[in-house]
Curated annotation (Swiss-Prot):
Tissue specificity field: Highly expressed in liver and intestine. Moderate expression in gill and spleen. Low expression in kidney, brain and heart.
Subcellular locations according to the entry: Endoplasmic reticulum membrane; Microsome membrane
Entry-linked InterPro entries: Cyt_P450, Cyt_P450_CS, Cyt_P450_E_CYP3A, Cyt_P450_E_grp-II, Cyt_P450_sf, Cytochrome_P450_3A
Lineage: Eukaryota, Metazoa, Chordata, Craniata, Vertebrata
Encoding gene per record: cyp3a30
This protein's UniProt keywords: Endoplasmic reticulum, Heme, Iron, Membrane, Metal-binding, Microsome, Monooxygenase, Oxidoreductase
Protein task: Putative steroid 6-beta-hydroxylase.
The protein, known as: Cytochrome P450 3A30
Reactions mediated catalytically: an organic molecule + reduced [NADPH--hemoprotein reductase] + O2 = an alcohol + oxidized [NADPH--hemoprotein reductase] + H2O + H(+)
Membrane topology of this protein: Peripheral membrane protein
Listed EC numbers: 1.14.14.1
UniProt cofactor(s): heme
Chief site of localization: endoplasmic reticulum
Presence of keyword Oxidoreductase: yes
Length: 496
């Protein structure tokens, strides 16, 4: 009769392996206990990531209620310090932003986006940001406004076809195409007209790019075994689909080459400012971007511009449809600012007070950046909290924006919270839909102009209305970016 037999040496090796595996599995999970910081109990390898199955925003909200203003979680083996204390937030995002903290954590598997402004660190980040910033001044935005209006007019025409048939609209489809068209035309002087060409490869590829899952095997592998990051990077593995990044880099390379070869003077857009930086000489030469950096910034601008603007417009339309009294008041301001459906102009649009209140309140409920991250470059103590070197500091804006102690009836849509009378009472380190400090969202003002123009021109002619296809309240998706689980659908009702 056969039996299972192991030599003493084999048993010794097996016990040693299991011991080392257990040490590896449990080693990082004493970090917050040593720092005197409470938090949910981690499990080996996963840390506290299994809680994300119900949505990271739900998890953040529950932790804030249970543990207060500071707590610790573990993304796999990575300790993450979560803070909602305004004093600590101010220090991390502003006061000590450049001296003690760098950008969000880098999982390394960024593919060709390794030098995008959202991933670059320290001096490289400063150089890239300084080149990009002039693209978003008031003067530049005013120049872009007429281009945006061409696409907002196209948006209205496309929506009208649905309204005329009394059919519901999938908001993300329309606002996504509008955002894509505005971004590509203002940034690269290229008109793809994705509103009339929904199968355009720019749109289909960006949708593939946005399908990110926290339980992606590649993401989990790096979370469980961080040392695998550099190894997998050598094999050119990436969180982003290679076919998608290849498409965008090839398209942008072609646009850039055509621009450089053309003798015609192009308007000064996002791409041109980056190309011009390469023509600097002397001391200014150090501020120029490489060819690859130009392509990476272009790619991230498409990615961020599409998602943030289209999602914000979708949530805003839903909030207006489910709060018709707010929509009516906003339409009254629109009619007073642009009587008899007059053409929308930049300056009056920027001065609309109630419109600002409505957008700010929608961004409170559904912030573009539901989590902000920084990484400590050196050990530092802030407001009595010790932050070790390499610690990830995470600021969860979702629970900050819905804290009942700060916002009475936090789930209610009340734009008056941001009125002239009340807005001075709002702590800028509590309300941060675009982040805060030197590393805030560089395209914030661009996104706001795009959003304001679309909503005003739509509400000049129509009202948003819930219909039998509208899910009220809608269920949030638990994976990846802040988004509804199912598409939000509304109807447009013509105004009398």
């Amino acid at each position: 009769m056969g039996y299972f037999y192991l030599t003493a040496e084999t048993w010794t090796l097996l016990v040693a392996f299991v011991t080392l595996l257990l040490v590896y599995a449990y080693w990082p999970y004493g970090t917050f206990k040593r720092l005197g910081i409470s938090g949910p109990k981690p499990v080996p390898f996963f840390g506290t990531m299994l809680h994300y199955r119900r949505g990271f925003f739900t998890f953040d909200e529950e932790c804030k209620k249970k543990y207060g203003k500071v707590w610790g979680i573990y993304d796999g083996r990575q300790p993450v310090l979560c803070v909602t204390d305004p004093e600590i937030i101010k220090a991390v995002l502003v006061k000590e932003c450049l001296s003690f903290f760098t950008n969000r954590r880098n999982f390394r598997l960024n593919g060709p986006l390794y030098d995008a402004v959202s991933i670059a660190e320290d001096d490289q980040w400063k150089r890239i940001r300084s080149v990009l910033s002039p693209s978003f001044t008031s003067g530049r935005l005013k120049e872009m406004f007429e281009i945006m209006k061409n696409h907002s007019a196209n948006l209205i025409r496309s929506m009208k076809k649905k309204a005329d048939k009394d059919e519901p609209l999938d908001l993300k489809e329309f606002f996504g195409s509008y955002s894509m068209d505005v971004v590509t035309s203002t940034a690269f002087s290229v008109d793809i007209d994705s509103l009339n060409n929904p199968s355009d490869p720019f749109v289909t590829n960006i949708k593939k790019m946005l399908k990110f899952d926290f339980l992606n095997p590649l993401f989990l592998a790096v979370a469980f075994f961080p040392f695998l990051g550099p190894i997998l990077e050598k094999f050119e593995l990436s969180f982003f689909p290679k076919s998608v990044t290849d498409f965008f880099y090839a398209s942008l390379e072609k646009i850039k080459s055509n621009r450089e070869a053309s003798q015609q003077k192009s308007r000064v857009d996002f791409l041109q400012l980056m190309i011009d930086s390469q023509k600097n000489s002397g001391a200014q030469q150090d501020k120029s971007l490489t060819d690859h950096e130009i392509l990476s910034q272009s790619m991230i601008f498409i990615f961020a511009g599409y998602e943030t603007s289209s999602s914000s417009l979708t949530f805003l339309a839903y909030n207006l449809a489910t709060n018709p009294e707010v929509m009516k008041k906003l339409q009254e301001e629109i009619d007073a600012t642009f009587p008899n459906k007059a053409p929308v102009h930049y300056q009056p649009l920027m001065e609309m007070e109630y419109l600002d209140c409505v957008i700010n309140e929608s961004l409170r409920l559904f912030p573009i950046a539901a989590r902000l991250e920084r990484v400590a470059k050196a050990a530092v103590e802030i407001n009595g909290v010790v932050i070790p070197k390499d610690m990830v500091v995470m600021i969860p804006t979702w629970p900050l924006h819905r804290d009942p102690e700060i916002w009475p009836e936090p789930e209610a849509f009340k734009p008056e919270r941001f009125s002239k009378k009340n807005k001075d009472n709002i702590d800028p380190y509590i309300y941060m839909p675009f982040g805060s400090g030197p590393r805030n969202c560089i395209g914030m003002r661009f996104a706001l102009v795009l959003i304001k123009l679309a909503v005003v021109e739509i509400l000049q002619q129509y009202s948003f209305s819930v219909c039998k296809e509208t899910e009220v309240p809608f269920e949030m998706d638990i994976q990846g970016l802040l988004a509804p689980k199912r598409p939000i659908q509304l109807k447009l009702v013509p105004r009398s």
